[in-house]
Amino acid sequence: MMPINLNLIMAFSLALIGALVYRSHLMSTLLCLEGMMLSLFIQMALLISHFHMFSMSMAPLILLVFSACEAGLGLALLVKTSSNYGNDYVQNLNLLQC
């Protein structure tokens, strides 16, 4: 396995572990999700260029568009919850909570 692939897999794994460990604050969860999406984007672009699959060359850009939409919605949710509750705890997003 190439060292760059190993580094990207480790970056994705660390971001996933970070999202699981620091899930109490919405901002840290969003940062970990962005790290996961960035490592997926780079891995996808490298694999497509390595295997010369130029018919799939739009796939990393589509992933990047979905990542930008996710970041925009996440930041809007962060602003709304912090203005309503005064903090960014994920437990405030639970609608079943009384």
Swiss-Prot record:
It holds the Pfam family Oxidored_q2. The keyword Transport applies. One of its GO terms (molecular function) is NADH dehydrogenase (ubiquinone) activity. GO terms for biological process: ATP synthesis coupled electron transport. It is a multi-pass membrane protein. It is an enzyme of class 7 (translocase). It catalyses: a ubiquinone + NADH + 5 H(+)(in) = a ubiquinol + NAD(+) + 4 H(+)(out). PANTHER family: NADH-UBIQUINONE OXIDOREDUCTASE CHAIN 4L, NADH-UBIQUINONE OXIDOREDUCTASE SUBUNIT ND4L. Core subunit of the mitochondrial membrane respiratory chain NADH dehydrogenase (Complex I) which catalyzes electron transfer from NADH through the respiratory chain, using ubiquinone as an electron acceptor. Part of the enzyme membrane arm which is embedded in the lipid bilayer and involved in proton translocation. This is NADH-ubiquinone oxidoreductase chain 4L. It comes from Distoechurus pennatus. The gene is MT-ND4L.
